[in-house]
Amino acid sequence: MRARHNHDDERDLWDTYATSVTREIGNPVMNWTQYAGHGPGVELLESPSTVLEIGCGTGRTLAYLAERGVRATGVDMSPVMVEAVRERWGDQVSFHCAEVLAFLRDHGEQYDAVYSIFGAVWFTDPAKLLPLVVKALRPGGSLVFSHPPAIPGAYGPQGMYKGGFAGRAQFTYRYSYTPGKWESLLLRSGFSKAEVRILDAPESGHIGTLIGRAVAG
């Protein structure tokens, strides 16, 4: 059974999250993992001229790329988040407030790279998202994404309540798979190449980071 997303409720959840993280937005940064200074960098995107970040959050990565001459576009479903990042980075980056599937269906623009850092790839049904990403990429363009690896034995859509487990029920879904399953999903969706791996944390026994890269055309 597929997860039953309620985008209105999820928008409220992400607005609550945005309120907590936009009080003080940090400096531009390029970091694929949850550990500062750990892991690969901008080279995963292979020198794009144009990028789209899906689930762009605070926009810090887009600002980093824009400072290096990349035409940067971001989409996020939270109006609170988008208002804050437009105020912070709007002179450098184009931000759109939209649900990612609707945005990709409605916008015909193509990009050299699409990426997600703990963003929409983690929170959106890949059967619906990945074919749309393929269409949004120029031939030879790449999708790069990162998020925590699946908990062993817990695969597919995983429900997640907003913190506290009390009050009005607000929840969303994360999509968790093994690297091999991600590669299969990517190839079945129309990518010509796919490589997904788990990068170990800098400290033994800590949570690693799943990093995927796929090429269109």
Please place each PLM-identified region on the residue numbering:
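Conserved class I S-adenosyl-L-methionine
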Residues: M1-S47, R60, V144-Y173
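Class I SAM-dependent methyltransferase SAM/SAH-binding core
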Residues: L52-I54, T58-F103
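A short acidic, Gly/Pro-enriched loop at the edge of an enzyme's catalytic core
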Residues: R105-V114
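A short SAM/SAH-binding and catalytic strip from SAM-dependent methyltransferases
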Residues: A113-A127
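A short glycine-rich, Lys/Arg-flanked "PGG" loop and its adjoining helix->strand segment in the class I
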Residues: K128-S142
